[in-house]
């Protein structure tokens, strides 16, 4: 059983050009023009800073790997277009974190919608 779960809601989506760094010290760099979803949760919500480079990678329906990039206040998750996630369908365990029970139908997450199951 997970020790805790995080429930968060996307607050906005932004199209970033290729080569744009996200997070402290450029934790993630866009390799192409990408939509990024912003979730208002992070270290201030007691997510350990040790998770910074150890958070799981999420696999999407099209097989693309998505990286969660926490910063002081936010989690960033790649999105395919405004107001639409790529539909997280499974989890992959990481060293100190996992994503669990996210369901199979998250294709349409708008600001105010919820994503659950990030655990450590």
Swiss-Prot record:
It comes from the Eukaryota. Optimum pH is 9.5 in the direction of L to D, and 10 for the reverse direction. Highly specific to D- and L-alanine and does not catalyze the racemization of other amino acids. The active site is at residue 24. Its cofactor is pyridoxal 5'-phosphate. Gene3D superfamilies: Lyase, Ornithine Decarboxylase, Chain A, domain 1. It comes from Penaeus monodon. Homodimer. It catalyses: L-alanine = D-alanine. InterPro entries: Ala_racemase/Decarboxylase_C, Ala_racemase_C. GO terms for biological process: chiral amino acid racemization. Signal peptide: none annotated. Optimum temperature is 37 degrees Celsius for both directions. This is Alanine racemase. It is an enzyme of class 5 (isomerase). Keywords: Isomerase, Pyridoxal phosphate. Belongs to the alanine racemase family. Its EC number is 5.1.1.1. GO terms for molecular function: alanine racemase activity.
